[in-house]
Amino acid sequence: MKSALPKVLHRLAGKSLLQHVLDAAAGLGPAHTVVITGHGAAEVEAASAASGAVFVRQMPQLGTGHAVQQAVPALSKTHAVTLVLNGDVPLITTTTAAALVQSCSGDKLALLTVELPDATGYGRIVRGAGGGVQAIVEHKDATPALRAIREVYTGILAAPTALLARWVMALNNNNVQGEFYLTDVVAMAVADGVPVVAIAAPSDTEVLGVNSPVQLADLERRFQRQQAEALLEAGVRLADPARLDVRGRLHCGSDV
């Protein structure tokens, strides 16, 4: 981000990226929320203290699977499902998250996927002859044939807590990056005979991450366009929707 500010504290529509995610999660009424911090941990924890989340630190950062490993002690085995979200994917909605959680009922692993014209950097969804999900292969580990796949993993999943805890604690780092990949739990689920379901995101806007000022600006515009369209559909007259910036929640009467 070319900034001293931790990435998840950069703002979109006047609210930090992380707060957008926490608000979406709060809409599900979770038993509790665990936030895994790394770079700028103290600053992130201070900024989000009012959320009531439990904070655990990932030191050092050894991959997405390693991150979830740090949260395992804070996950009560009485919690039927664990939903994994990303602090830099701010526009995920409560509705989509709820659908994903519902999809993993009956001891399934549920993945949120999307098809992208340019899938660079994303893990590819590998399906078997019958169409079922068999694995996720990270971009850096993918062959040219696998990189041609456009269906990708968004980084968001839901799974029965006991199964997820067992899988992540069994991860290894035998890969190009020498990291513990959360995506490896898919192959573990398949090996255990646990069904893996892939739920398509309603739009790529919900699942795009922020890794640069350019991407942040793009999501800001997408978000504001969504707000403008919602207001127009509610009957609000906007002379130029492209020049609207909404902060917080806006309630309008008729003939505004």
What would you call each of these model-derived segments?
Residues 34-35, 83-84, 109-112, 198:
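Structural beta-sheet core signal
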Residues 8, 54, 132, 195-197, ...:
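Conserved beta-strand segments of alpha/beta enzyme cores
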Residues 177-256:
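Left-handed beta-helix
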Residues 11, 91, 158, 209-210:
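Short aromatic/basic micro-patch
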Residues 42, 92-176, 183, 194, ...:
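Conserved core of the sugar-phosphate nucleotidyltransferase
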Residues 11, 15-102:
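Conserved N-terminal catalytic core of the sugar/cofactor nucleotidyltransferase
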Residues 6-11, 57, 171-174:
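Short glycine-enriched, charge-decorated loop/helix-capping segments at active-site entrances
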Residues 1-4:
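N-terminal nucleotide-binding beta1-loop-alpha1 segment
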